[in-house]
Amino acid sequence: MMAAVAQFSFVIPSVETRDLAGDLRELFAELDATLPHDQRVYSGECHPALDVLETQSAVEVIVDVAGVQAEAIRILFRGDTLVIAGEKAPGPGTAQPTFHLVEREFGRFARAVRLTGAFDVSRASASLRAGELAIVLPRIAERRGRPHIIPLTNGERRS
């Protein structure tokens, strides 16, 4: 039996795009400053696959990052967007190899997933195991939009 697939919106408005671009610049600048010279990638792009799954208590994002060290990954949640950025460095190789087949990707990567709902990001967690990055965002009760009675007093204003 196959699991249900929920629809998520991936269109990000232009103001949020500018914020996201700034966040990505900061994340990559931090990686440049902290990664050892031999783990830094100067060109190339990597496109790791990801899954987004929802349970009753959380949303989980699983990203395939085989060969990427934990110190080469940054995770950020802003507004309703989860951003995963990092660098996958090529393994040590011989000088001037002759390739017969090239399928693996190396370089910087950034994935952004827009999520709906309310999350307790202070309890969010991420773990890297066997080449899979698992990010768990616990849900909290949505309070926005619920009616809330504001008491009315007769007399002077309160500050």
PLM regions: where:
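Short, well-ordered beta-strand segments enriched in hydrophobic/aromatic residues
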Residues: 59-65, 134-137
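Core FKBP-type peptidyl-prolyl cis-trans isomerase
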Residues: 69-97
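An anionic, turn-rich surface loop/hairpin at beta-sheet edges
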Residues: 92-112
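Structural motif
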Residues: 58, 81-83, 132-134
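C-terminal tail/sorting-segment detector
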Residues: 138-159
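N-terminal leader/pre-domain low-complexity segments
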Residues: 1-62, 85, 90-94, 157-159
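Beta-rich strand-turn-strand
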Residues: 69-74, 114-144
